[in-house]
Swiss-Prot record:
Signal peptide: none annotated. It is found in: Cytoplasm. The gene is sdhE. It comes from Yersinia pestis. It holds the Pfam family Sdh5. The keyword Chaperone applies. Keywords: Chaperone, Cytoplasm. This is FAD assembly factor SdhE.
Amino acid sequence: MEIDNKARIHWACRRGMRELDISIMPFFEYEYDSLSDNEKQAFIRLLECDDPDLFNWLMNHGEPQDSELYQMVKLIQSRNKARGPVAM
């Protein structure tokens, strides 16, 4: 997936678990444009992971082995925490 194809990335942000939608969608909407190209690639790679893995990582029940994915999970968590709750 290309880093500038925002429609496809937005669609990939839609997950099968509401908990993931609450974490991933606001991050994409509010933060994606400010990411570096490398961070955008890591975000896209993260979206290719299975929902159970994403859920566990974002809820601090484990972490990805890949260091770039780990950094992206931490970035999503910190930016979402700083922004506060978002109604969906």
